[in-house]
Amino acid sequence: MCGILAVLGCSDFTQAKRVRVLELSRRLKHRGPDWSGLHQHGDCYLAHQRLAIVDPASGDQPLFNEDKSIIVTVNGEIYNHEELRKQLPNHQFRTGSDCDVIAHLYEEHGENFMDMLDGIFSFVLLDTRDNTFIVARDAIGVTSLYIGWGLDGSVWISSEMKGLNDDCEHFEVFPPGHLYSSRERAFRRWYNPTWFSESIPSAPYDPLAVRHAFEKAVIKRLMTDVPFGVLLSGGLDSSLVASITSRYLATTKAAEQWGSKLHSFCVGLEGSPDLKAAKEVADYLGTVHHEFTFTVQDGIDAIEEVIYHVETYDVTTIRASTPMFLMSRKIKSLGVKWVISGEGSDEIFGGYLYFHKAPNKEEFHTETCRKIKALHQYDCLRANKSTFAWGLEARVPFLDKEFINVAMNIDPEYKMIKRDEGRIEKYILRRAFDDEEKPYLPKHILYRQKEQFSDGVGYSWIDGLKDHAAKHVTDKMILNAGNIFRHNTPLTKEAYYYRMIFERFFPQNSARLTVPGGPTVACSTAKAVEWDAAWSNNLDPSGRAALGVHLSAYDDKQNNLINNKPVEFEKLIPMEAPSLGVAIHS
């Protein structure tokens, strides 16, 4: 993937304007250190900073169709590009890049080809035949994208806010799953899955369907011509990703080029829960494991850089982005260009600790829908920008469109957390990979309780951040915060500290409006705070705020899961038994 910048329909065609576009494009150079390009056609500029992963030798951008009448600059990975090429037999492709199909699909289908793309992407396509353009962003918003408008009537597009904030009168986050057409001068949502309406699904839970869909999501993301690895925290999600990758790597083209030995990476404070759990999983899977430690001071020293790169003042995002930012630098120094990661599972399966308080399956499901829709503002933002700060790409198989459709079509009663019945968070995901004949993971890892990333890297990390902020923000500053920051007023010294840094880098009103706000507990939406009256006055978004839920050890019923005595799920809800001959413990 890469960094893109486009200025469309501007009134200035001078050399000075070209120099300015190049200057702004260089603000995105960290996203694509391998190559840069700028194409001008009349009043339109398309700039690109490339991180070369597929066809690194010839896939430089912008990309064109045969007669160069269609021009595309894109940040993305199209996993089904080989299949799409076969559907375009009358087209000649100029490169082996996975994104080369976009211009040709547009020639065949006009603006109506977005659903055909299986992957993650943000792109600008210029049709020079009538000087029109379209802009599109992937379904969930794994890739970052912003849109802005200049006083001269120009439209600006950038992978990061820093590429356009100084030159636009107004700018905002480009909505995921949408297309912007210059013909209509409006957004149109192209991603319309059944779960988006938040209606309650009724399909029975099929553990094999969940397993196979997720394995497929992981395997398709092993498309590469460069070295890669897996982020491994030792929790359920990253461990499953690592297990599947390790299991299937030998059968992929990547193994022919880079070997079948998987490299795994973990970060944490010395002695943190994640380091210990990740080492155990790595030993079990036989990966080449790289363990990075940092101190609280290391993290504090990086905070300003993190806020500049991640472009947010959201507390939980900054807490979690900082260790990931530090780890990404180390990973890139080893020659690795991309990693596969476990973001998205908690949103899909209700894995956050506050889901224990969901009053019924309807509330549970609508909250998962809200969380998925907001991912581009939180975990996707973190995974994309904290890694790309060092030219490292993160791929997230849990956010595969097909997998989301399978998981979100399941009756949410199966996802409900019922501790008195031994059903912990994400039970149906755990059970789908509980294979006695060929285990994916050790039992105690498969049933390890959820840790927020910022907690798992070491509990003293958050405490250290709070202590540091308290040295820079006084009680008087907090009392007057509402007069200084009228939008998303910070309520804690830590939040105020981050906001001050953010405003220094991004002082525009449009910038502060790109960051979500509102009450939250353990990463909940504002609506879910209503589930427990005790949460209404909570100021700490950490998972530890969900008192009585986060346990240092499992109770007896949870221990039964680890000790080969899973809860008898089928007695709760009738369910079809698996029939494909794969051992699923029940």
Swiss-Prot record:
<dbReference type="InterPro" id="IPR006426">
    <property type="entry name" value="Asn_synth_AEB"/>
</dbReference>
<protein>
    <recommendedName>
        <fullName>Asparagine synthetase [glutamine-hydrolyzing] 1</fullName>
        <ecNumber>6.3.5.4</ecNumber>
    </recommendedName>
</protein>
<keyword id="KW-0028">Amino-acid biosynthesis</keyword>
<dbReference type="GO" id="GO:0004066">
    <property type="term" value="F:asparagine synthase (glutamine-hydrolyzing) activity"/>
</dbReference>
<feature type="domain" description="Glutamine amidotransferase type-2">
    <location>
        <begin position="2"/>
        <end position="185"/>
    </location>
</feature>
<keyword id="KW-0061">Asparagine biosynthesis</keyword>
<keyword id="KW-0436">Ligase</keyword>
<feature type="active site" description="For GATase activity">
    <location>
        <position position="2"/>
    </location>
</feature>
<feature type="binding site">
    <location>
        <position position="231"/>
    </location>
    <ligand>
        <name>ATP</name>
    </ligand>
</feature>
<feature type="binding site">
    <location>
        <begin position="50"/>
        <end position="54"/>
    </location>
    <ligand>
        <name>L-glutamine</name>
    </ligand>
</feature>
<feature type="binding site">
    <location>
        <begin position="75"/>
        <end position="77"/>
    </location>
    <ligand>
        <name>L-glutamine</name>
    </ligand>
</feature>
<feature type="domain" description="Asparagine synthetase">
    <location>
        <begin position="193"/>
        <end position="516"/>
    </location>
</feature>
<dbReference type="GO" id="GO:0005524">
    <property type="term" value="F:ATP binding"/>
</dbReference>
<keyword id="KW-0315">Glutamine amidotransferase</keyword>
<dbReference type="Pfam" id="PF13537">
    <property type="entry name" value="GATase_7"/>
</dbReference>
<dbReference type="GO" id="GO:0070981">
    <property type="term" value="P:L-asparagine biosynthetic process"/>
</dbReference>
<dbReference type="InterPro" id="IPR017932">
    <property type="entry name" value="GATase_2_dom"/>
</dbReference>
<dbReference type="InterPro" id="IPR029055">
    <property type="entry name" value="Ntn_hydrolases_N"/>
</dbReference>
<feature type="binding site">
    <location>
        <position position="98"/>
    </location>
    <ligand>
        <name>L-glutamine</name>
    </ligand>
</feature>
<dbReference type="InterPro" id="IPR014729">
    <property type="entry name" value="Rossmann-like_a/b/a_fold"/>
</dbReference>
<dbReference type="InterPro" id="IPR001962">
    <property type="entry name" value="Asn_synthase"/>
</dbReference>
<dbReference type="InterPro" id="IPR033738">
    <property type="entry name" value="AsnB_N"/>
</dbReference>
<keyword id="KW-0067">ATP-binding</keyword>
<dbReference type="GO" id="GO:0005829">
    <property type="term" value="C:cytosol"/>
</dbReference>
<feature type="binding site">
    <location>
        <begin position="341"/>
        <end position="342"/>
    </location>
    <ligand>
        <name>ATP</name>
    </ligand>
</feature>
<keyword id="KW-0547">Nucleotide-binding</keyword>
<dbReference type="InterPro" id="IPR050795">
    <property type="entry name" value="Asn_Synthetase"/>
</dbReference>
<dbReference type="Pfam" id="PF00733">
    <property type="entry name" value="Asn_synthase"/>
</dbReference>
<feature type="site" description="Important for beta-aspartyl-AMP intermediate formation">
    <location>
        <position position="343"/>
    </location>
</feature>
<comment type="pathway">
    <text>Amino-acid biosynthesis; L-asparagine biosynthesis; L-asparagine from L-aspartate (L-Gln route): step 1/1.</text>
</comment>
<feature type="binding site">
    <location>
        <position position="267"/>
    </location>
    <ligand>
        <name>ATP</name>
    </ligand>
</feature>
